């Protein structure tokens, strides 16, 4: 039930870390579906927008009267707290947010996997060639992202885009032309010459 699930912030982070490692080992996007859900639905709710208060547990529904002392849910707080007796959540949240780049991308030699559609810029080296990758968009409020891959010279490489399990009519345009590609373990993989590409 929504009012009695525990959804501990640190347990959610552990789930995300496990999912990330499994996805990286198996190259299976279903793990990143779990990671994405954990990050958006629990981790981000565990910290206030100003970063000064936190939830230890994150039930989906809270009735303040049921959180009073000497009730079965007195450990649940109806508002975020500035600190806890056991304060693992605040540093764990900030550490996870600081390492978000490791969740967005995986790299294996000349292959780059785009796992999370979070606006960002990063630099990678594919086959010895420096590339700048830029993701632009307003996910999850909008369902369109632009991914720019900008290399200093042309090289053979592969870029894999995660197809979220909830995505309907997912398609990729490469330099304005629709790609006719098949899905492999939840990723659409595009291989070949890469230089200055827009997806």
Residue ranges and their predicted role:
Residues 1-163, 171, 183:
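Aromatic (Trp/Tyr) and acidic
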């Amino acid at each position: 039930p929504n009012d009695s699930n525990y959804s501990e912030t640190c347990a959610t982070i552990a789930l995300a870390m496990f999912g990330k490692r499994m996805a990286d080992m198996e190259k299976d996007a279903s793990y990143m579906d779990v990671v994405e859900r954990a990050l958006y639905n629990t981790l981000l709710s565990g910290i206030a927008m100003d970063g000064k208060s936190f939830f230890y547990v994150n039930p989906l529904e809270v009735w303040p009267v049921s959180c009073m002392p000497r009730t079965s849910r007195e450990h649940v707080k109806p508002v975020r707290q500035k600190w806890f007796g056991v304060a693992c959540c605040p540093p764990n949240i900030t550490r996870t947010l600081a390492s978000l780049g490791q969740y967005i991308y995986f790299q294996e030699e000349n292959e780059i996997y785009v796992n999370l559609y979070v606006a960002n810029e990063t630099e990678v080296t594919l086959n010895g060639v420096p590339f700048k990758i830029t993701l632009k968009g307003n996910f999850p409020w909008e369902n369109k992202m632009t991914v720019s891959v900008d290399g200093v010279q042309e090289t053979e490489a592969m870029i894999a885009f995660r197809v979220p399990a909830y995505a309907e009519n997912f398609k990729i345009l490469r330099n304005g032309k629709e790609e006719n590609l098949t899905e492999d373990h939840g990723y659409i993989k595009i291989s070949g010459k890469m230089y200055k590409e827009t997806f």
